[in-house]
Amino acid sequence: MKHKAFFIFMTALLIGSPLYAQKYKIALIHSYQEGYSGAGIVNKLFVKGLKDQQIDFQLRTFYLDCEKYESVEEEQRISEFADSIRSWEGDLIAVLDDQATYSIMACGNPYVR
């Protein structure tokens, strides 16, 4: 009986606990520059989606500014972003738009492999 009561208590405790109790460090990388109209909308929707799911998070946003740089420079910049995220001990990197996605896959940084 004692074990059964303990099992019921632990089950109730686990069911009642949010699965998202951990605070996640999330990096969001945009292809375009800060101030780009679409970036603001995406940032708001991204944050709203996380909050709607009751996910506790800390967000850092990076802007690749792909129209300003050539591919080699973009890959270097995004590799530096990855190093910064690693130092910050980020849990997740979300990449938005084609150019940032290509650059992060091509940069060769071991943190994003």
Language-model features, listed with the residues they occupy:
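Short hydrophobic alpha-helices and adjacent helix-cap/hinge residues
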Residues: 2-4, 19-113
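Bacterial N-terminal signal peptides
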Residues: 8-16
